[in-house]
Amino acid sequence: MVPLTERRSTRQVYLTIALLCAIAGSVDALAYLRLGRLFVANLTGNTVFFAYHLAERHWLSALERLAIILSFFSGVITDRFVQRWIASGRRAWNPAVVSLIIECGVLCALAFLSTYGSLRVALLVTLAWTMGLQNDAFQTVGPVSLNTAFITGDIQKLGIAIASQPADEQATKKRRQQVISLATAWLAYVVGAILGAVGSQTFALRALLIPAALVLIALAMELRARN
């Protein structure tokens, strides 16, 4: 793959993080409110409920949770295959851009589907796959390493960054950037979830067009940040 040069200011780093986390927050909220009270990006709770439903012999509910977990997992793997395919052909493409294009197309398509019967499960697993794809595509944004589809690890990293003791001015600057980035991730997830909840009340599943629009903005920024 032809090396990609990144041209991303600190402000663009923060905005990209905010957009990606708002996307995930809105998708997760919409899935929870419209598709049976299940999350598609936060797998810790799904794992706990998978175990609970197994213990209670609620086999279909357990299978739903397991399907979401495996779909998120397969989204991560898909993104890795996309990266490998681009690299093997020496294509001058940005893998993150490809993943965002896929994500936007999927969200737009799902916004116009029904939520009844087996199609509801198909929507859940497809959204989970999309979140896995996004999270792997943006393991780092500029110099910041974080998750954009779920935030438990980001909150942990935020605590570590706040409690750290920088040895010099450069380390202090790096810590400040990490703190702002990780705090932005959490706040944006909250805002995204609010957008998803409000959109769900007004537009039902068509509110998936809200995160799709945010993906388009993130895509435009990604195209500007790299050549």
Language-model features, listed with the residues they occupy:
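Alpha-helical transmembrane segments of multi-pass membrane proteins
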Residues: 2-227
